[in-house]
Amino acid sequence: EQLLMVDALKRASAKRITAVLPFYPYSRQDKKALPREPISARLISDMYVAAGVDRMVSIDLHTQQIQGFVDQPFDHLTAMPLFVDYFKEIVDGPISIISPDAGGVKRATIFAKHLEAYVGFVHKKRDPKVHNEVKSFTVIGEVEDRHAILLDDIIDTGGTIAAASRILKERGALSVNVAATHGIFSEGSVEKLHDAPVDKIVVTDTLLQNGNPDKIGNVEVLSVSPIIANALTSIFTDDSVSALFMGENVL
């Protein structure tokens, strides 16, 4: 529908078209994992460019190289300020920020700086032939007698979060909270997360939840509207978007 709207605006001689994609579709498919697979993230960007967009805006991309799929300006926003403010209010005591994978350590490090926290990550061994299947988990970092916050960009099946939260509890974490920008909550995830030893799951409204927070029971949904509004204001007044995040939107 958004592509159709872009086409309609282009045909109506719009001076400039900015497409806002709070959640970038197929962002995890930015490269081939197996032979004869599509690079779906690249296809999405090609479709928007072909439709006529002049600029794209998205929040917490799974991989930032997606910005290089288009020659047009591509603004990458982050919901991290929302999570920082939220956890400053609800967590009192020593904190460890845990990334569910090694690739998210940089994001976790920036997040930890604002909360004066330790940083760790979960090493996952995946089976490339089985979609969303993880063989084993290992926690790297100090979590004993600390409040652990699992920080990720996406919650999909919930398998990683459920398994990691149990390991963190076994390692002596005082509490386990989860912060993820995009709550996909695909089939089967509600049951996994409902049974997981997680105190609070915090996501944003980049995706429509359709009652999932109520089913899981301990989910808080934060609005990204202020972040998008401030970014669009900066874009249309020719101000710096990165300045809104003090450069910390480049992860």
Identify the function of each model-found stretch:
Residues 1-251:
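PRPP-associated nucleotide enzymes
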